[in-house]
Amino acid sequence: MKKVTHIVEELVTPIVTHMGLELVDIEYVKEGKNWFLRVFIDSPTGIDIDQCGVVSEQLSEKLDEIDPIPHNYFLEVSSPGAERPLKKARDFERAVGKNVYVKTYEPIDGQKEFEGLLTAFDGQTVTVEVKVKTKKKTITIPYEKVASARLAVIFS
């Protein structure tokens, strides 16, 4: 049996592609007593509430047709926000030159969390320039060791 997120991805991808948008992420989570199906969309120029509404309506119709979720849930369609997740290689490629927060599966140079400027991504390694006190240090992280990553808003 397919996971709910895979089914939703198959349903929503043609909708967002037709609208010239990008599917960023899908979450299906239980919070308290309620289930939430969250779909995050974006475009190079950003998205607006009307685009979210259209995607929500069209996806809701498709979900009603096949009914893959056996209980009540809330459908939310939105932008991924300023600290959008970096999930795919193309996300990292687009984020070069931006501030990021990266968690790794195992320690690299004695730590598992890094925040700084993403200076390079070659498909195999993620290179982040971090500040250590008053100096800058370059950390090279093997791509397969990245547990999670997102854009980071850094206040100086």
From Swiss-Prot:
GO-annotated cellular components: cytosol
Keyword list, A-Z: Cytoplasm, Ribosome biogenesis
One GO process term, biological-process aspect: ribosomal small subunit assembly
Coiled-coil segments: none
Secretion signal, residue range per the UniProt entry: none
UniProt keyword annotation of Cytoplasm present: yes
Subcellular location per the Swiss-Prot or TrEMBL entry: Cytoplasm
Protein purpose: Required for maturation of 30S ribosomal subunits.
Annotated NCBIfam families: PRK00092.1-2
Family: Belongs to the RimP family.
Protein name, UniProt field: Ribosome maturation factor RimP
UniProt source species: Anoxybacillus flavithermus (strain DSM 21510 / WK1)
Primary gene name: rimP
